[in-house]
């Protein structure tokens, strides 16, 4: 994937989490943020341009691991997300690619598609005529679930530890980003480009909660229509800023080579 997308992974609102060393106060929130294509070394590489908060705060006040690696070569979206969410390799958690060949049917399968769990509500599926992600177009059903994930995730383990008090959510622009991080015990919500709203499948919910309906009713995505993402400074002020627009780059429909 050439575009950088952010998956706000797991928001776990819980009490009584047991760690190796019990903190003075119980941990009530665990937030996992997974950024597509953001290698660990890039955090320091671009650190000179950081402002207050954000990555600067994480570097100054957090623990930064400079030599942490996972043993897989295929760096597609679902592979990395599932590896970070489970702590296991693709050969174990099963998410080996965005699309793989099903040995039983002999057909290509999209990683989180599941005909048994259709999308909740109408008009939220993938529109193949406008979808720019070729892997999404290969799905033979609009249904989605974490069934293909063979191991438990961080959220699953915390749910097992805490029980019904744990509130586990995965939120992402992409279905595969939200589902892998929400796991089997959480609830995944992702953005429907067709419907312009956050959606889920019947694996997770029988009806949308009021707070999701309220957010969708605000029409936040529509407020960004006909607007562009403008740089704060001149292009030459950025590292590699002058090389951003090249003739050999992919020209995404509706986006161009830069946006």
PLM feature segments, named:
Residues 40-43, 77, 178-182:
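Extracytoplasmic/secreted cell-surface and envelope-processing proteins
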Residues 88-259:
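His/Asp/Glu-rich, glycine-adjacent segments
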Residues 39-45, 68-71, 139-146:
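Second-shell loop/turn segments in exported
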Residues 1-4:
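Positively charged n-region of N-terminal signal peptides that target proteins for export
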Residues 18-22:
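Boundary at the C-terminal end of the N-terminal hydrophobic targeting segment
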Residues 27-39, 58, 84, 158:
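Beta-strand elements within well-structured catalytic alpha/beta cores of enzymes
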Residues 7-16:
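Bacterial N-terminal signal peptides
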Residues 43-92, 167-169:
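Short, structured active-site-proximal loop/turn typified by the sulfatase FGly-forming signature C/S-X-P-X-R
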């Amino acid at each position: 994937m050439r575009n950088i997308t952010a998956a706000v992974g797991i928001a776990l609102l819980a009490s009584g989490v047991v760690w190796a060393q019990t903190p003075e106060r119980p941990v009530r929130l665990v937030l996992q943020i997974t950024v597509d294509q953001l290698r660990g070394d890039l955090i320091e590489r671009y650190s000179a341009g950081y402002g207050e908060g954000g990555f600067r705060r994480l570097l100054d006040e957090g623990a930064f691991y400079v030599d942490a690696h996972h043993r897989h070569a295929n760096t597609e979206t679902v592979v990395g997300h599932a590896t970070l969410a489970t702590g296991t390799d693709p050969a174990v958690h099963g998410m080996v690619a965005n699309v793989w060949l099903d040995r039983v049917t002999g057909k290509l399968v999209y990683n989180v598609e599941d005909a048994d769990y259709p999308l909740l509500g109408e008009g939220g599926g993938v529109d193949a005529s406008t979808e720019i992600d070729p892997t999404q177009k290969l799905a033979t059903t609009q249904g989605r679930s974490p069934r293909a994930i063979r191991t438990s995730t961080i959220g699953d383990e915390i749910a097992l530890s805490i029980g019904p008090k744990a509130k586990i959510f995965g939120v992402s622009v992409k279905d595969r980003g939200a589902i892998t991080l929400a796991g089997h015990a959480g609830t995944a919500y992702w953005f429907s480009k067709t419907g312009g709203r956050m959606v889920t499948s019947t694996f997770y919910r029988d009806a949308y909660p009021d707070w999701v309906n309220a957010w969708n009713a605000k029409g936040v995505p529509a407020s960004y229509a006909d607007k562009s993402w403008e740089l704060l400074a001149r292009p030459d002020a950025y590292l590699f800023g002058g090389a951003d627009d090249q003739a050999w780059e992919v020209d995404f429909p509706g986006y161009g080579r830069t946006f």
